[in-house]
Structures are given as structure tokens and as C-alpha cells.
């Protein structure tokens, strides 16, 4: 057995590399990292005897190694190889030139007459079998090559790190044969190829993407397999030269998969119950209330949210609310309150955590958010809704926001729409991705949520086309359309987010790993692909701060005949939104600005601008090229720290209205819904609903 490995937590304890080993019966064989951080081979006869051979040289973190073990059953000879393979580029941000290499190089020989007992454990890469059966299966969806259900073993001792070019042979190979096979199965002699049982090249099925969960055995045995729980693909391999930064331009240098012991794509829970909803229920956001013994308390009650959509292809209202479910997924089960070193600094206070936060801190098996780090310190780039998402609950209070965040904050809007008797349908980001502009064109007015931060390419195209086709769009958030997020091509329950070289971000992808596995395109900020948000919605993300929110004052454009109808019932000098449920004001948490240099339409009207933000409200870092004292300060001294309210007309009697603040909707219900934030939004929606040209 052999492979190139790039361990990222070699000191974390026993981890399986290449194993056909059953932990319960101590039978079979396996190549492991042991409890001493060394490479080891284990052979078990299933009768209580286990042979372990260790390299006795510690593996170093973020260093590529060629590792191999050979066992001659006739002679009992065992050989174990551990050799670093370091180049100036292949470790990315890890170690480069290693001196001296012999500190972590090993060649160990031994003799052993113990024979490995055959077992029913599958051959695993990056884990070891604890029990042969788990009663959990993979089939269909992103496992489309699994034509019938395949039962998974209960695995353990999961490896953290990369693996490239694993091989298994049916004879004990010499060192030169190991090195020849490591370079490539196809380049080996016919004699050596005949001895190889499996040669898995993870780059073999790279096309214009590498979304596949199938792994290819390049031998004539075709022992193809599956990667489970979506470890990261499109990863630089042991031979990455940095000549190409895109994996499908030079697939041979992207033969690695990065495995993590906390990867999850699907909890694989069984269905407990189903409930058929009557047709008379209108479109909206609902929840299934679950209770223990019918008791109403935080300890005995939970709410599982879901959306009831209008009949397929039909609109049942003139107004559509697009629920920003991509953003919900990106933040799902985030653990920043317990893990981030800057949580208290961001919030300006000690984070107030809920029971869900504390539970998730202890139960990492529910998976992480794209704001989290894996246990080895690498960023989480996939998020799936096929698991319990404990911070996507109607009663959840997020630790970061001054009040509510994501789904809960968007319920401020639906509550207000109900209060104002404005009929509306609800659809999701996923629906928009699938149906495109045809979905939006069924509605006269389209509303966003408070934080539509994550968008796919098809979603952006739909919003742009809607505006060109006379659509009337109200963007009710901030930090919108900021990060690229793409759906898995075979399973829309899963999104991918790569955090690139710029942006206000929780982590940064390693060099050469900026391109999405799901579509092969550059990940990170839409700005980096020339699609800055202000070209989509007229505003661009400018500042963030999580202590208190502020207010707006009207600008001269608001009094022009084309715009004054939006402010009907609002005084010329009236302070707008110095109240609310999110930080005490309508302008807060995250802010967007009007900027003609960055794509705000030249016909846009600047209606109002926020002021008096604190110094915890800071400008986004992608616009800060030098850190200069006193130049890029907080809200009291930086003119870029502001929320701009805008309005502009689009072709065919279309228009856009946007207040430029994430906390805007939190002010709608103040004073029994009788306030100027509520009045402005009601004027905008009712004006957009009128037939004919706008003023």
C-alpha cells in the first residue's frame, strides 16, 4: 500500500490512511498515523493478536510525504517507508524547504509471521472501519453512480489532511517500484502494472468541474469508489508547481482530496413522519412545532421551518418575497461565538450565546458553517441542509447581531406584510436558481430579505434580467450579492463557497484552491469576477458593525417630483429610523453605499443617508489597500461608513428601491407599525404595484 499524504493534524491521535481493518475484531490490515504521530502498519489475525510496526519518526504538519508499507506473506518481511516530498510550492502556505529531512524520514524493516485475517470491512481511504454495518446508505443525488443503495460502514479514526494517488498491489514492491508507481500507473512497466490491484487517481474524472463523488481506479480491475461526506476536491497535489492556479487547466497537479474528520453532507436520518398540507394554505413561511409531552418550554419545544410555495409555474400574488436560503446555509450551525478569537471584538461585547450555540459547541457532528474552520484549521467550503440546522429556528437569537439575524430577521418583513394586508408569495434562492427570470417575471414586485449575501451565477442573471424587463425590485438588505455560492450540480441541497484572496471573510482558501469544485469557476467575491453588487442592485457593501444601529436623514433628491411620493407622510427634516428591534435603529449591522465609480446607475437618486455610527462600524477590508493610522477609521471619522437609500428607474417602467441597511426591516413594527420606516416601505411597494409609468 502506498500514497502521498499531507497530514494536517498528525498529533491528533490514531487516523486511518489506507485500511481494510475492523476495529471491533482487530482483523485485517491498515496503514495509519498512530497515537505518537508516526506512520504505522497494523496487521490483525482477528484472534487477539495484532502486529504494529511504527516508523518511529514523527510526521510533520503540512508536509507532503510518500508513505508505503509492504508485506510479503511468504517470508513475513515487512517494510515501512516515510519520505518527505517538499518543493517550494507544493505545501501552499505550509512548510517549504525542510532542513534536515532525516528528522522525519524513515525506512523500517521487520519480520512477522502473523497473517491478516480476511474480514468484511470495505477498503477505506482516510478512515478505518469500526463496524461493518451502519444501516446508512448512499444512493442517487450527488452519489448518482450508486445505482442501488450502498450501505456504509460505521467509520472512525478519520484522517485530517490530503491524500494523493493511493495504490494497492498484490505483491511486496521494492522501493524503486513504489516510486515508479507513485509517478503514475500508466507509465509503469507491463510487469509492474500486472501486480497492481488498485490505482486511484483522484484527478482522473476532472472535467470543467470536480463535483463528482466518484473516484476512479485506473487499473483494469475498475475498483471505483465513492467519497463520502464531501471532502474537498480541486485541491493541490504533491506535485503542484503553481504554474497553473485552476485545477482543470492542469488536472495532474490537482490529484489530492482534502479529508476532514468533521465533513458532513447528509445526516442520513430516517423519515419519522410526514404530513400532507391542505391546498388552501397560502404561500408563506411556516414551521412544524415539535414538543415533548405537549409542553411549551425551550427544553421541550422546537420549530422546524419550511416554505409553502405557490403552485408550480403560477403566481398567487403580485408580490414575491425571495427567501435568501443560500445565506441561511452559509451561516448554518456557525460556531464563531465559541471558536472565533474576534467574536467579542466584532460585537463590542461578550457574545450572548443561546442553548443551541452551547449544544453545537459540544456536538460537532451536526456539521459546520462556511464561517467555520475544520478541526485542522482549514476553511469549510461546503454546507448542506440535509442535517439539523439549529440556528435556523424562529426563536433563535444570534450572538453576533444586536438582535436577530438571517431567518429570524426576515420574519420581521413577513410580519409587516401581513400587518399591512399586502398579499405575497414566498420562494427560495434555490427556486430562483432553477427557474431564473421566468420566476421573477410572474410578479410585479419582488422583495429580497435582509441579508441576501450569497448568490449563484444564475440568480444574479435573473435579477439583472428582471430589471431589464420592467421588473420592480425592492432590495431590503445590505451586504447583498457579495459572495459566489454555487449549488452542487447533482444535489441542490448543497452549496459551495470558496473564500478567495479578498473580502470580509472568516478564512482564506489556500493558494491554487480558489476555484469551485461544483462549477470550476473562480470562487470568492462577485466583485473579483467583475460583478460588483452595485451593478446588480445599485449599492455595494461598505461597512459592518455589530454594536448599535443608527438613523437616516433625507437628501435633496428625496424632494424631487420623481421621488417625493416615496416620502409621502414623512417630514422634510424628520429623522428616519432612530428606533427598531435590531440595534435600536434602521441603519445598522451591515451597510451598503451609493458609488458611481463602482457601478451605481447614473440615474440613481440618493434619497437618504445614515449618520452617527460608532467606531465599531468599520469599512470593508477589500477597499483598504494600506493600513494607515487615522485614515480608515470607524463611523465617527470615515465617510465610507454609511447606509445610502436609493431609487432608480429601469427600462420598460421598471424600478429599484433600496435602503442599504441590514437592520431596516427590524424597524418596521415600531410604534404599532406606525413609523416613518414603515411608511416609506409601504409607499414604495404600493407605488410599485400601481399600473402604468412611475412618476
Segment roles from a protein language model:
Residues 1-233:
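Extracellular glycan-associated modules
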Residues 30-31, 42-44, 79-83, 90-95, ...:
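Short, solvent-exposed loop/turn and secondary-structure capping segments
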